[in-house]
Amino acid sequence: MSSFDYLKTAIKQQGCTLQQVADASGMTKGYLSQLLNAKIKSPSAQKLEALHRFLGLEFPRRQKNIGVVFGKFYPLHTGHIYLIQRACSQVDELHIIMGYDDTRDRGLFEDSAMSQQPTVSDRLRWLLQTFKYQKNIRIHAFNEEGMEPYPHGWDVWSNGIKAFMAEKGIQPSWIYTSEEADAPQYLEHLGIETVLVDPERTFMNISGAQIRENPFRYWEYIPTEVKPFFVRTVAILGGESSGKSTLVNKLANIFNTTSAWEYGRDYVFSHLGGDEMALQYSDYDKIALGHAQYIDFAVKYANKVAFIDTDFVTTQAFCKKYEGREHPFVQALIDEYRFDLVILLENNTPWVADGLRSLGSSVDRKAFQNLLVEMLKENNIEFVHVKEADYDGRFLRCVELVKEMMGEQG
């Protein structure tokens, strides 16, 4: 017998033809015939519900299996991802509830080796981006402000989380965690069974505390969507023919990472026919925007550190030099893009004419160098002045500066 024989009986009792039933239920007659004879392995729930509704029958709904994962995700790491992937393959719907507390989170940052503090939006974005193709995963943010940390805050926290889940309509069948000590607490305070995933950390031996303490040491455990947050940026500045581009390339090679080339040179070739004589004030915002995109790309794919050929202060300095005024859009990017290490190269290497340079005299080079220093100070940008005149000495000095910035983490 077919599991849908009761539908055949209902159709006969109502005296309807298959075509009439199919039309009313939003399906073809052929699909309905195969459905009634159990020829379709995974019938559409929507079509089945429409068919039951037309025949006046109650649609037999299967109880969903709901899972929930709690965490700070500060930061998200591959151990979290393993837990979540295991959980979401065992349930129909998985809810990830990210807890945040401004005071606690600030303390975690201050006790860490992280160069910047992740915001709540940063942490949500990591989760949303990482699991965006898995439609049975839902992401939530839960404010834990004022709740004592474990193990003292279970009563207050559990009351808060129960109210939160009730508001969101979340009725978990199971809680998934890797923390063995939390399982009895979840059962006692929430009345929900816990499924432990890799509690011994045999597959993913990592914790958020380890990454906060030394991100670069545990780089392999930081997910693709999270790595750009931890990337350190090094901007190499200097006047024309100061060796910036060559040095950036050499540094990226030696640190096995990415670099952002000077977009202004590409812009001159692609928009001005390779000659700066047509450059005007309205070009500087486009140059700055293009350079920002180069930087973002380099940071996204970097291996711990990204090297930047020329910063926005330099772009602004050229605008001021040639146009007699600063550009507000370029200034906005100066304010937005703050690099971890800014190296200003002394303009004391041989000047090389390449068709895109016009400040070749010693007087012009010195004046532009002074302008760069002045504007860096005006924008409260700390920098290291590298004065070595020979290329090898300059290279070695910059390598040491980068290693110093990376610290023991490098």
Swiss-Prot record:
Changing residue 21 to M: Loss of DNA binding activity. Residues 230-410 are annotated as: Ribosylnicotinamide kinase. It catalyses: beta-nicotinamide D-ribonucleotide + ATP + H(+) = diphosphate + NAD(+); beta-nicotinamide D-riboside + ATP = beta-nicotinamide D-ribonucleotide + ADP + H(+). Changing residue 43 to L: Loss of DNA binding activity. Residues 18-37 bind DNA. One of its GO terms (molecular function) is nicotinamide-nucleotide adenylyltransferase activity. GO terms for biological process: NAD biosynthetic process. Transmembrane segments: none annotated. Changing residue 354 to N: Affects RN kinase activity. It is found in: Cell membrane; Cytoplasm. SMART domains: HTH_XRE. In the central section; belongs to the bacterial NMN adenylyltransferase family. In the C-terminal section; belongs to the bacterial RNK family. This is Trifunctional NAD biosynthesis/regulator protein NadR. It comes from Salmonella typhimurium (strain LT2 / SGSC1412 / ATCC 700720).
